[in-house]
């Protein structure tokens, strides 16, 4: 990782003796098969329950695969996220989370301590090396502003999105316990993969089904009623976003 990119996102992995608590957490051991936008969207959904997120950073380059940085508004949120999500099975791989080494540029700019870094002199750089460098995308300029990630794919933050049919969604009237769960109050940006990431950590998980015509709801199937009940008890009220707590019940049959 180049010095500029490392500093911009918080310095990369902390030193072995640990970095001091700060607002940026560094995550590695992430599933490298997940597409970049899906990865950032999933991380934002999982970590937003701990506090306001200013930025989620991940890069396409080979040396940055399997890594990401989440910048919170305050240290308390970052600390709670680190403690709560350490080793969480994110896309079937346990997350390794640490504090980033240095203050990220996004925070330095906000508190007025930001000092631009001088670019390395390249007068003596070999022509072929310079040409190769110029052909590469300058990842140090990707997503470093406070408003770079107002929401997924440039949309408003999930907390600002209207919840379609919020007044119409009601819990099933009489429900017989069974192996299929009915999940409500999901933000519009929720994907089957995001829900699978949450529910697959419980035994007996089979699949997630969503209905495009009815955003905000999903069905999650388990092997038997007992397995479905265990998952429901653990995830009831889980915050997909700060304003979206999952409402889980048994599905009608």
Curated annotation (Swiss-Prot):
Cystine connections: none
Subcellular location: Nucleus, Nucleolus
Region (Disordered), start-end ranges: 111-140
Any GO MF annotation of the entry: RNA binding
GO cellular component, one term: spliceosomal complex
Alphabetical list of InterPro entries matching this protein: Nucleotide-bd_a/b_plait_sf, RBD_domain_sf, RRM_dom
Taxonomic superkingdom: Eukaryota
SUPFAM superfamilies in the cross-refs: RNA-binding domain, RBD (SSF54928)
CDD domains, A to Z: RRM1_U1A_like, RRM2_U1A_like
Keywords assigned: mRNA processing, mRNA splicing, Nucleus, Repeat, Ribonucleoprotein, RNA-binding, Spliceosome
Chain ranges of the RRM domain: 23-102, 179-253
A Gene Ontology BP annotation from the UniProt entry: mRNA processing
Subunit architecture: Component of the spliceosome where it is associated with snRNP U1.
Family, per entry: Belongs to the RRM U1 A/B'' family.
Known role: Involved in nuclear pre-mRNA splicing.
Protein name per Swiss-Prot or TrEMBL: U1 small nuclear ribonucleoprotein A
Species the sequence originates in: Oryza sativa subsp. indica
